[in-house]
Amino acid sequence: MKQEHIMKVFWTEEAKIEFKQTLMYWTIHNMSDSYSKKIDVETLKLVKEITTSPYLLANYIETIDAYKRVFFKSRFILYYQVDEKNDTIYILHFRSSSQKPL
């Protein structure tokens, strides 16, 4: 059986901050962390998928030289770059789909 190739993942500081702020916003807005936990789980699922198939269902955004994946009922967007030479995925931004596009 052929083993699946898994790329490394690196979150930029900006992406980490955006992700944490989103989770905090929904926890405060809903007065509960249950929705934030769902966002976290769906994000981890997507990142895992990207590590093995980075181009699957992704749109390339030439102006920012990054790939874009919309996920979790089209509510959130992950922007990332693929560095095949270093076998790494760089998560650049985590955004709500209601925010102004990059």
What is each stretch, according to the model?
Residues 13, 30, 54, 74, ...:
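Short, well-ordered turn and helix-capping elements at secondary-structure junctions
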Residues 2, 72-102:
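Enriched for short, Lys/Arg-rich terminal
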Residues 14, 62-66, 102:
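Localized chelating/binding microdomains
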Residues 39-54:
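Compact soluble domain cores
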Residues 23, 44-47, 95:
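Conserved protein kinase catalytic domain
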Residues 1-41:
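Arg/Lys-rich, positively charged N-terminal/basic patches that mediate binding to nucleic acids
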Residues 53-85:
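Basic/aromatic recognition patch in beta-strand/loop cores that engages polyanionic ligands
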Residues 23, 51-58, 102:
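Short amphipathic alpha-helical interaction/hinge segments
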